Swiss-Prot record:
Record's function text: Plays an important role in the regulation of interdigestive gastrointestinal motility and indirectly causes rhythmic contraction of duodenal and colonic smooth muscle.
Similarity-based family: Belongs to the motilin family.
Chief location: secreted
Recorded GO MF terms: hormone activity
Subcellular location: Secreted
Name assigned to this protein: Motilin
Native source species: Gallus gallus
Biological process annotations from GO: smooth muscle contraction
Region feature Disordered, mapped onto this chain: 1-22
Keywords: Hormone, Secreted
GO CC field: extracellular region
Compositionally biased region (Polar residues): 1-11
Basic and acidic residues compositional bias, start-end: 12-22
The gene coding this protein: MLN
Amino acid sequence: FVPFFTQSDIQKMQEKERNKGQ
């Protein structure tokens, strides 16, 4: 996996996934 995402972008994506779960 190539980390072409920034740490902040990863956190935003994770938050979106959590919102989908809810």
